[in-house]
Amino acid sequence: MSTPMILRESRTSTTFSDQLLENAKSVGCSPPSTAPGDIDPGTWDKIKNHPCFSEEAHHYFARMHVAVAPACNIQCNYCNRKYDCANESRPGVASEKLTPDQAVRKVIAVANEVPQLSVLGIAGPGDACYDWKKTRATFERVAREIPDIRLCISTNGLSLPDHVDELAEMNVDHVTITINMVDPRVGVKIYPWIYYGQRRHTGIDAARILHERQMLGLEMLAERGILTKVNSVMIPGVNDEHLIEVNKVVKGRGALLHNVMPLISNRIHGTYYGLTGQRGPEAFELQALQDRLEGTKLMRHCRHCRADAIGLLGDDRGHEFTLAEIPDEITYDASKRQAYRQLVARERGDHLVAKNEANRTVMSVEYGGSLLIAVATKGGGRINEHFGHAKEFHVYTVSQRGIKLAGRRRVEQYCLGGWGEVATLDHIVVALEGIDILLCVKIGDYPRKQLTQAGLRATEAYGHDYIESALGALYAAEFGIEPPVKTATA
């Protein structure tokens, strides 16, 4: 029996909900999700539905952040917190601050309409551990109303050691710490001040205290079996080379994942780095650094989430769920989320088979080169996005070593109102520099021609296929080997 497609076009409509239920019924019993070979089953069970901790999960599951923690105890040179901003896509920004009660109401509304939702996080817009009373109250109330949702926090780590035991008691089993240095001499270039022990600290003293508290918190989390992801901002000329040492240190202290993110530096954001002209890294610089890191598993699918982000990574739906749109009284209905999970279990089983076949194909090539391939996707692990509608492209390296996600390239949407913008296309061509081939479900003649002139081949030939199946078949065609039988896509 063929696998039903995961529909996403009418995401909040009754038709979509009904289709999910019908699809879930049609697939019957679902096979269990299998842990990858490099992850133990216990860890896999915790991360398999968390879109930030599992690259595979981000194709299928959504996260939600609630902006209940505006207070912060450090100042970073790359941060300018904003609490009523709808236009910027970066950490520390939210459209509206919430009380714990408002947050619970919003979480129920989202859970009822977004069946992909699996995780609730508190990531500010300040610091979740420093603004602890609001964080704790929110988690306690959400856990009572929606007991099957996973809880996680993001923190700078300064106040983390004070609350690790409480996090464990509340079954918070995923924590992200932003660690940009393990040498206070580097830290003084990133943090003007911290607030700790009832007073403000500056200079080397501030960086030293922050470092010591971050390391203590990381060790305490590891001792209690709480999974930790470390975020690091790559700041060219400040900590880029130093992040190699950061990677080694955080692995030794128990971090599961390391996510190296590019500095977002724009004057209009009002950050110190933005106003002083500190540049962010180019895409190739970020990838080159990531490729040099050894130790923890790397997260390469980060989206720089806002403090009020909602939805699949790369598809923020926060604007659909403002407080004004949510009823004062609302009851949780688990049926959509339960049906969706049944559907996804079957889809993931088929996807895993296709992924393994594709990797066997490319690794069987005796003489083959390396390809850098961009993919337009809107979820489900498939090539299912029109070139003109894409706001980002997933980038994969394909070689005899296998198929690996290398990162993503952000772009402006080319096609608006049915027409493409020439200036936007020029920027897309620049953003895709170094890419050999682009895969999408549809592309117009003009953008295809412009990409070809820039040395980039675009093709619709693998539309709606699993990404890895398409990459394997494409690699086989490029290097003259027999590809596996094509996996059914509908």
Swiss-Prot record:
Involved pathway(s): Cofactor biosynthesis; Fe-Mo cofactor biosynthesis
Protein's GO biological process: nitrogen fixation
A Pfam family annotated for this UniProt entry: Radical_SAM
Entry binding sites for [4Fe-4S] cluster 2: 302, 305
Record's cofactor remark: Binds 3 [4Fe-4S] clusters per monomer. One cluster is coordinated with 3 cysteines and an exchangeable S-adenosyl-L-methionine. The two others probably act as substrate.
Binding residue positions for [4Fe-4S] cluster 1: 72, 76, 79
E.C. no: 4.-.-.-
Residue ranges annotated for the Radical SAM core domain, each copy included: 58-308
Residues bound to S-adenosyl-L-methionine: 78, 126, 178
Keyword Manganese included in the entry's annotation: no
GO molecular function: 4 iron, 4 sulfur cluster binding; lyase activity; metal ion binding
InterPro entries named in the record: Aldolase_TIM (IPR013785), Di-Nase_FeMo-co_biosynth (IPR003731), DiNase_FeMo-co_biosyn_sf (IPR036105), MoaA_NifB_PqqE_Fe-S-bd_CS (IPR000385), Nase_CF_NifB (IPR005980), NifB_C (IPR034165), rSAM (IPR007197)
EC class name: lyase
Key words of the record: 4Fe-4S, Iron, Iron-sulfur, Lyase, Metal-binding, Nitrogen fixation, Plasmid, S-adenosyl-L-methionine
Required cofactor names: [4Fe-4S] cluster
Entry-linked Gene3D superfamilies: Aldolase class I (3.20.20.70), Dinitrogenase iron-molybdenum cofactor biosynthesis domain (3.30.420.130)
NCBIfam families: nifB
Function: Involved in the biosynthesis of the iron-molybdenum cofactor (FeMo-co or M-cluster) found in the dinitrogenase enzyme of the nitrogenase complex in nitrogen-fixing microorganisms. NifB catalyzes the crucial step of radical SAM-dependent carbide insertion that occurs concomitant with the insertion of a 9th sulfur and the rearrangement/coupling of two [4Fe-4S] clusters into a [8Fe-9S-C] cluster, the precursor to the M-cluster.
Family assignment from sequence similarity: Belongs to the radical SAM superfamily. NifB family.
Name of the molecule in the record: FeMo cofactor biosynthesis protein NifB
Protein source organism: Rhizobium meliloti (strain 1021) (Ensifer meliloti)
The gene coding this protein: nifB
